[in-house]
């Protein structure tokens, strides 16, 4: 689909131009992070891997009759990230109620709709609901070797899962795992333990590994657990990496952890354009082999 401007749609007002996505409104940046403004997407410099993670809130913001369809804006946002790997959570495969409500609801699953030209979309459902299903997705401009899904549901009230995708990045295999952990602290601990067992079972010890997503963790317990498994992220010294809630971020719930790669920097886009699209802000990280 053509994406030439940001659009906003609600049931009441219909589609209208919002504003141009670029340049991003950013109040805080890292010197190592540059997001290009050119429209065509060339791969970054050799051996530099850019990974983004984004909880897209199922492509809809707001409640009741004032809710807005943001999936078109999110498509532009993903394109402008210019990432090698984009890890998405709360991605709808389909939803009959929303498709009937919004005139501009895409006629393809959200993962396919959000994938920029030349990218491959890999999706797996975590949750089945009355009107549809949603889960995790990974978008990449590099060849996909294999992919698999594992159920991580810890109790019957939350359906969770991990998506594992192996991509061939500049001739080297890189493993990426997309996660969306539970709301209960004990569940998250058990899910991290399950993640570790999955890594030990499915991923070669020396292979570069990325684990990204919405960890739903307001503290540092999971960070310590992941560090004990050899997974680390870029350590920021200020509040520039807070991602939730998008309008006034108080915590960094979204992370990109790696093994076998060197973290170089993080970037969290700021501003009204971004907090209107989802309840989370995206997080973009760069790594060096």
Describe the residue ranges of each PLM region.
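N-terminal, active-site-proximal structural segment of metallo-dependent hydrolase catalytic domains
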Residues: 3-6, 11-116, 128-133, 193-194
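Metal-dependent phosphoester-hydrolase catalytic domains
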Residues: 10, 24-39, 166-168, 197-209, ...
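Beta-strand-turn-beta hairpins that frame and shape the catalytic cleft
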Residues: 42-51, 134-136, 140-146, 158-178, ...
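A short, structured active-site edge motif that brings together acidic residues
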Residues: 117-130, 148-153
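Solvent-exposed loop/turn segments connecting transmembrane beta-strands
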Residues: 130-131, 155-159, 185-187, 275-277
């Amino acid at each position: 689909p053509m994406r030439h401007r940001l659009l906003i749609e609600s049931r009441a007002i219909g589609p209208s131009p919002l504003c141009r996505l670029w340049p991003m409104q950013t109040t805080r940046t890292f010197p190592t992070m540059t997001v290009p403004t050119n429209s065509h997407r060339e791969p970054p410099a050799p051996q530099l891997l850019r990974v983004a993670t984004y909880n897209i809130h199922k492509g809809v913001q707001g409640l009741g009759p004032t809710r807005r369809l943001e999936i078109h804006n999110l498509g532009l946002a993903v394109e402008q990230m210019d990432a090698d790997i984009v890890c998405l959570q709360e991605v709808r495969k389909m939803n009959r109620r929303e498709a009937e409500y919004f005139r501009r609801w895409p006629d393809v699953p959200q993962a396919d709709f959000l994938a920029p030209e030349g990218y491959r979309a890999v999706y797996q459902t975590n949750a089945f609901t009355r009107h549809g299903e949603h889960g995790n997705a990974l978008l990449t401009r590099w060849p996909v070797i294999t992919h698999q899904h594992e159920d991580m549901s810890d109790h019957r009230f939350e359906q969770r899962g991990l998506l594992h995708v192996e991509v061939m990045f500049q001739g080297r295999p890189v493993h990426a795992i997309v996660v969306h952990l539970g709301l209960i602290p004990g569940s998250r601990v058990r899910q991290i333990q399950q993640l570790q067992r999955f890594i030990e079972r499915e991923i070669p010890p020396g292979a570069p590994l990325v684990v990204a997503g919405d960890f739903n963790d307001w503290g540092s317990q999971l960070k310590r657990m992941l560090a004990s498994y050899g997974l680390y992220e870029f350590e920021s010294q200020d509040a520039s990496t807070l991602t939730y809630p998008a309008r006034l971020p108080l915590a960094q719930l979204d992370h990109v952890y790696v093994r076998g790669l060197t973290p170089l920097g993080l970037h969290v886009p700021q501003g009204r354009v971004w907090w209107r699209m989802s309840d989370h802000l995206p997080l973009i990280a760069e790594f060096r082999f």
